[in-house]
Amino acid sequence: MILDTVDEKKKGVHTRYLILLIIFIVTAVNYADRATLSIAGTEVAKELQLSAVSMGYIFSAFGWAYLLMQIPGGWLLDKFGSKKVYTYSLFFWSLFTFLQGFVDMFPLAWAGISMFFMRFMLGFSEAPSFPANARIVAAWFPTKERGTASAIFNSAQYFSLALFSPLLGWLTFAWGWEHVFTVMGVIGFVLTALWIKLIHNPTDHPRMSAEELKFISENGAVVDMDHKKPGSAAASGPKLHYIKQLLSNRMMLGVFFGQYFINTITWFFLTWFPIYLVQEKGMSILKVGLVASIPALCGFAGGVLGGVFSDYLIKRGLSLTLARKLPIVLGMLLASTIILCNYTNNTTLVVMLMALAFFGKGFGALGWPVISDTAPKEIVGLCGGVFNVFGNVASIVTPLVIGYLVSELHSFNAALVFVGCSALMAMVCYLFVVGDIKRMELQK
């Protein structure tokens, strides 16, 4: 008994924070791999002789595959568990990132098609990642900590841009665009090995103390999420009537469409923002790598603060509905200020406005906490997949729309209006469509 007590004390009482740190790091690399082409894009387009419209299609290739795999990916997560599916996802997205560094070995006529294919397979492989993050947070964190935890892993996208944009810009400048992809691929392979070793279910984790397990399970964490019973919703497959129930629920539809509009802002920054700075503002690639990190850092700060503020409101006794909606509405109002960049030629002011807009986007990007709060507990992964289908339609639409606008109008002005209006539409979804935020119950 004494030995048992000693062993128990050696275990972590905050193992969930270690899990969150790992998710944060993996998500940062996830977004860096998405953004590799935007940083190297000017040089890639020049060497492979690609037009703005062609680049728009290549940027959107990720989104086509990412969207197509969302519902199958969510079902795979519910059936096989987060650890196993995420392991394969991480390995293969790292592989296809690595291989993008070799597309110049193809004849020029095929190089653009090869890049499109690699980006398509990158999206295919990354598809389960965010639904898996939502499942892991739902399994490991009590309700009152879930907003902060979700905001932290979601803010990894901004931290990623802040950390990797200067690095990838320097690699492009000093070593060539090919090394942007090969270096990121190798980082992903290392993370795959660490993931296998460090990630476990709450009830199986060797560092998990009985005290922490009791605390999280009694306060809303779904600790047995991956302990599936025969005949459960996950075990029996992605039934069409489950998806129909999600799509006929007004609250869920408001959340789904809101995520589409929020993601439009994200995909502008992930694809065209560095090219905007080069073509519209005349910056060098090396300078763009540094400048792009400023809005990203502000987005990171906004992302963390939005989650903390939301959970603070819950702890003060405010309703879950108000605590989630207020940061979203305020954040989207700030994000819409991106339109003001059309009214100044001052580069410093443009960067400041972009930073304010990205801070607002981060502050209001609480879609994943809302999904953790509202998804039917039997199909959290599937619900996250449907949510991500809606959200990542933006990964297809945004690059293409901006590519055509820039090609036809020879300016980014209309593109910034498109992005700013999307922020306002996200606000409308949460104010007038979502209604009360509560967990949806499946009709069996």
Curated annotation (Swiss-Prot):
Protein localization: Cell inner membrane
Keyword Cell inner membrane: yes
UniProt keyword terms in alphabetical order: Cell inner membrane, Cell membrane, Membrane, Transmembrane, Transmembrane helix, Transport
Catalytic activity: galactarate(in) + H(+)(in) = galactarate(out) + H(+)(out); D-glucarate(in) + H(+)(in) = D-glucarate(out) + H(+)(out); (R)-glycerate(in) + H(+)(in) = (R)-glycerate(out) + H(+)(out)
Mode of membrane association: Multi-pass membrane protein
Cell inner membrane listed as a keyword: yes
Residue intervals passing through the bilayer: 12-32, 57-77, 90-110, 111-131, 158-178, 179-199, 253-273, 289-309, 320-340, 351-371, 386-406, 414-434
Induction pattern: Induced in the presence of D-galactarate, D-glucarate or D-glycerate.
MF-aspect GO terms: transmembrane transporter activity
Membrane topology, Cytoplasmic segments: 1-11, 78-89, 132-157, 200-252, 310-319, 372-385, 435-444
First-listed, main subcellular location of the protein, grouped into a coarse class: membrane
Gene Ontology CC annotations of this record: plasma membrane
Record topological domains on the Periplasmic side: 33-56, 274-288, 341-350, 407-413
Chain's role: Probably involved in the uptake of galactarate and/or D-glucarate. May also transport D-glycerate.
NCBIfam families: 2A0114
Family to which the UniProt record says this protein belongs: Belongs to the major facilitator superfamily. Phthalate permease family.
Protein name per Swiss-Prot or TrEMBL: Probable galactarate/D-glucarate transporter GarP
Organism: Escherichia coli (strain K12)
